[in-house]
Regions:
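Acidic-and-aromatic substrate-binding clefts and catalytic sites of carbohydrate-active enzymes
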Residues: 38-46, 65-75, 99-108, 135, ...
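Active-site gating/metal-coordination segments in enzymes
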Residues: 22-27, 77-203, 252, 259
Length: 367
């Protein structure tokens, strides 16, 4: 019953909004220029670039110090080859290793590695959730993002006019038992990644403490543009996201791998979610988290990578589904939340920012 009312309300709301603000259609998908600001292209093949070209996307492939991915050098080599193949369409973000953090020379080595990546074309630097959840200092204590040991590196990144992409904490579902999680994609991920399922590790940092450390970091580095990967791990509440964006003018967020959490909310309060996207249209970047990784029997990536001949079709399907939700009023079944989800039908001017202009502003600094 709730879904039926949501669909009716969405149709009425979209109709009223559409009278004043033109929207895109499903058929507009390939002709509108777009930028996926969060992918992982870890294979030296051209299929990702091919489907991106066909669908009208530029890509930002993000290197991550993630044990399920190839090592950092291999990731860097692949992204540089793909950038050379299509420099106008393919871009990349670098990262750094936490190995040796706090020891003499770590800051200098890290800054030198960042400079080398910039020389190769890096547009941003990524920090991952191992900061705060895995990496420890020489005393055996977890290292949080607001640790002063990062300050000189962050100042260096800021001096180079690069943004920092920060994946901190996890979806709030991570601190719930599996049966209480709101989306099936979170449930399956944490079932397969028990080491990151914080409900099973009450001795580990709380969700609130990780978010607080991230917020202190963003406040301390006001001159650094901080892109909150995965909706800044505030995916569960557009109200909390609004508070975060209001408090920190240097913050933006990407949508990567969190669309179902947004859809979970829009099924319950369509008008609120639509209004959030309109109000914060300059602060939200489209990202998918699509991952093309070498096949591995032990692979357990958050978005299971799609390899081989099926990748272009699956990527195209994923992108079109997101487009239908954000840009049109089309309703589609979303199994991850067991609901029929009407599209938000955001105005064209809003879509153009979320899908392209914001990424160009943040990552190219006006270039």
């Amino acid at each position: 019953m709730r879904t039926r009312f949501a669909i009716l309300a969405a149709a009425l709301f979209a109709s009223a909004a559409g009278a004043a603000s033109p929207t895109y259609s499903v058929s507009d998908f390939t002709r509108v220029r777009k930028f996926d600001a969060h992918v992982h292209a870890n294979m030296d093949v051209l299929s990702f670039l091919t489907v991106a070209k066909n669908d009208g996307f530029e890509l930002l492939s993000i290197n991550v110090d993630y044990p399920d991915f190839p090592d950092l050098k291999t990731q860097a080599d692949v992204t540089q080859k793909l950038q050379a193949a299509d420099p106008k369409r393919f871009h990349f973000a670098t990262t750094f290793s936490m190995q040796g953090f706090g020891a003499p020379g770590w800051t200098e080595r890290t800054n030198a590695a960042i400079d080398a990546a910039i020389a190769e074309g890096a547009l941003a630097v990524k920090v991952w959730k191992n900061i705060g959840m895995v990496a420890k200092n020489s005393s055996g204590h977890l290292i949080f993002l607001d640790d002063p040991g990062f300050d000189d590196v962050m100042a260096h990144i800021q001096s180079k006019h690069l943004p920092l992409i920060a994946h901190q904490a996890e979806p709030k579902n991570c601190w719930l038992p599996l049966e209480q999680m709101t989306t099936e994609n979170d449930r399956s991920y944490f079932k397969d990644h028990p080491e990151y399922h914080m409900f099973l590790h009450p001795d580990q940092p709380s969700y609130e403490s990780l978010i607080a450390a991230r917020n202190r970091f963003v406040a301390r580095h006001r001159g650094l543009q901080v892109v909150g990967a995965h909706l800044g791990s505030l995916e569960w509440s557009v109200d909390e996201l609004a508070k975060y964006l209001d408090t920190y003018p240097n913050a933006t967020v990407d949508l990567a791998a969190r669309m179902t959490q947004v859809q979970y909310q829009s099924v319950r309060d369509y008008a609120k979610v639509q209004a959030f996207f309109v109000k914060y249209q300059d602060r939200i970047l489209y990202g998918s988290d699509l991952t093309q990784n070498p096949p591995s029997a032990s692979e357990r990536a958050q978005n299971p990578p799609i390899t081989g001949a099926e990748f272009p079709a699956e990527a195209d399907k994923f992108w079109r589904s997101d487009w239908a939700y954000l840009a049109t009023n089309k309703s589609q079944r979303v199994d991850a939340i067991s609901a029929d989800v009407p599209g938000l039908a955001l105005p064209r001017s809003v879509i153009d920012k979320i899908y392209y202009a914001n990424a160009r502003r943040v990552f190219f600094n006006g270039r």
